[in-house]
Curated annotation (Swiss-Prot):
Region Required for interaction with GvpE: start-end pairs: 318-362
UniProt-recorded name of the protein: Protein GvpD
Organism for this UniProt entry: Haloferax mediterranei (strain ATCC 33500 / DSM 1411 / JCM 8866 / NBRC 14739 / NCIMB 2177 / R-4)
Cell compartment(s), UniProt: Cytoplasm
Gene transcribed to yield this protein: gvpD
InterPro entries named in the record: GvpD_bR2 (IPR046777), GvpD_P-loop (IPR009788), P-loop_NTPase (IPR027417)
Pfam families per UniProt: GvpD_bR2 (PF20440), GvpD_P-loop (PF07088)
Length: 545
């Protein structure tokens, strides 16, 4: 076969990473496997198959066989812009089944069910590791069966085909015309089903269900997918530690704020929101169940970074389950210590032990954390001041070693990250109070001389804010600030936050992936990914269409 078109050669991101790993392992493990691809019309079966051929072409020859439309039309619709495969990889059995991209000696003039297996054997003999996709298998069977007076049924032919594939180490994809269960599922080695539906607000939800894959352990049977840009892509899991940076990874380049908007700090999200968050607005970040304890940082960290990089003040009341020192460690790795110490104010409070500090839960139901590497240790849960103590000790140590306090400056390690002597902490007895908080941020405003960002976990700040949300929203609007209110599953605080919020976003888990979507404004489902090609990992969003 001709060499792949270099313009469309699959990269790691375009191929194996975005193609389900379990399916790749299914084909690259034991040779001779046959995969049945089920799904109703419009679910993306053909695009899934083409993506698979792109992946498998890297270690062998591939052939896409159809009877639906001619070679040129198939190539124009599915291959030309989105695949490394050219027309020679496409075969229309209804036109000329012997017009092959290989030098094949076929000892018969007409292709039928009785000669199909021999035809495949001749192709295999002229190729290296071979993959053939039949799309759709039912239509190809019917076309070939029409040439016989007394043809065997499709189950018999499929059994013979699968047996040949195992014997000759041929990889097969059989695309079905239906999503319904069929006897073919018991014959083949693997079965996947593509599904599509709309939620109550009209959002498209697409999934790939891994029914069975011989020889492969399936940890997550239902995987979110998208057909964005006319290509099949699996929306892959995100490990939250990769969202954050390590020491000396790079310097955050500030994104531009406009007179009407604050940048979200996420390049893919700003255009969806017509430039970012409105000035003077309240954003509700609604966390779904079974998210790791640091999931709140996915949407908020980029905004915090961008405010600080623009030398604007930030006040953060993080969730009490959050990793100790998360903000301090992240922000000091992408911004100068002076910027963090001057403009960022983090209030760690203690509001009682959580039943499971490693995850968000709903109505008493405890879920397994997505990111077990970030789960709190038993000592964290047992210490009544675990989060505060660990963070403050780290801050105190780093300040004393790198930035000694100026004469007369007080470092209040028990209540907030850094507090000058002229600022009185709003945290008393481990609890945040509303009026002292407002007085504190007014002093911060004088120092930064501009709008402020408030990031407040409502679960942590409940006693201070639950009866004052209306007043707080008015304050934010009056001063052209930005506030992000974070709520956890199954609490009344969700409804209260919604009543004052100008925008409402929800972060939820789908399979092992993390999805973001807007309830107000209404947005599509957006899969969260990470671009690690830059010194600072960047959030990327993939629309589910």
């Amino acid at each position: 076969m001709p060499p792949p078109n270099p313009a469309y050669s699959p990269t790691e991101q375009q191929g194996r990473v975005l193609f389900p790993r379990e399916v790749s392992r299914f084909f690259t493990g034991d040779p001779g496997h046959t995969l049945l691809v089920n799904g109703a019309p419009g679910t993306g079966k053909t695009l899934f198959t083409i993506r698979g051929l792109d992946v498998l072409e890297r270690d062998g020859d591939v052939l896409y066989v159809s009877t639906r439309v001619d070679q040129d039309t198939v190539h124009e619709m599915y291959f030309r812009e989105h695949s490394s495969l050219d027309k020679t990889h496409i075969l229309d059995l209804s036109q000329d089944p012997f017009e092959l991209p290989l030098d094949v000696d076929v000892p018969f003039e007409k292709l039928g069910l009785d000669s199909l297996l021999e035809w495949i054997q001749q192709i295999k003999a002229a190729s290296k590791r071979l993959t053939i996709a039949f799309d759709s298998w039912e239509l190809i069977y019917e076309y070939l069966a029409s040439r016989h007076d007394d043809s065997p049924d499709i189950e018999t032919v499929t059994t013979q085909l699968v047996s040949l594939a195992r014997q000759e180490n041929i990889r097969l994809l059989l695309v079905s015309e239906t999503a319904d269960s069929s006897p073919l599922e018991y014959i083949v080695d693997g079965v996947v089903t593509l599904q599509v539906a709309e939620d109550e607000r009209g959002r498209t939800r697409r999934y790939l269900r891994l029914e069975k894959l011989r020889g492969v352990r399936i940890g997550n049977r239902l995987q979110p997918i998208t057909l964005a840009d006319g290509q099949f892509q699996a929306i892959t899991p995100v490990e939250l530690p990769t969202v954050r940076t390590g020491a000396n990874n790079g310097t955050w380049e500030p994104r531009t704020n406009t007179k009407a908007k604050f940048s979200t700090g996420i390049g893919d999200l700003d255009p969806i929101l017509s430039g970012g968050y409105n000035r003077g607005s309240v954003i509700h970040l609604d966390l779904g169940t079974d998210l790791s304890r640091d999931a709140w940082s996915v949407l908020t960290l980029p905004t915090i970074r961008n405010f600080l990089a623009n030398e604007m003040g930030v006040a953060v009341v993080p969730p009490r389950e959050g990793s100790p020192g998360l903000l301090h460690n992240d922000l000091n790795s992408v911004l100068t210590p002076r910027v963090f110490d001057t403009y960022c104010h983090v209030f760690e409070t203690y509001a009682g032990p959580s039943r499971n500090r490693g995850t968000y839960e709903e109505d008493g139901q405890v879920e397994t954390p997505l990111d077990t590497s970030q789960t709190a240790t038993p000592s964290d849960a047992e210490s009544p001041v675990g989060t505060e103590t660990e963070l403050s000790e780290k801050v105190e140590t780093e300040l004393s070693e790198e930035n000694p306090p100026a004469p007369g400056e007080v470092v209040d390690t028990e209540r907030s990250t850094t507090i000058g002597k002229e600022l009185e902490s709003p945290v008393e007895g481990g609890q945040l109070d509303y009026e002292p908080y407002m007085e504190y941020v007014e002093e911060v405003r004088k120092q930064s001389d501009g709008p402020l960002l408030h990031v407040i976990s409502m679960d942590t700040a409940r006693t201070a804010f639950e009866t004052r949300l209306g007043d707080f929203a008015n304050y934010v609007a009056l001063h052209n600030d930005l506030a992000i209110l974070i709520t956890k599953p199954g609490t009344e605080l969700r409804r209260r936050a919604d009543r004052v919020a100008d925008m409402h976003f929800r972060l939820e888990r789908s399979g092992e992936a993390i999805m973001l979507y807007g309830e107000n404004p209404l947005t599509p489902l957006l899969g969260i990914g990470i671009d690690r090609s830059q010194p600072i990992p960047e959030i990327i969003l993939t629309e589910m269409v």
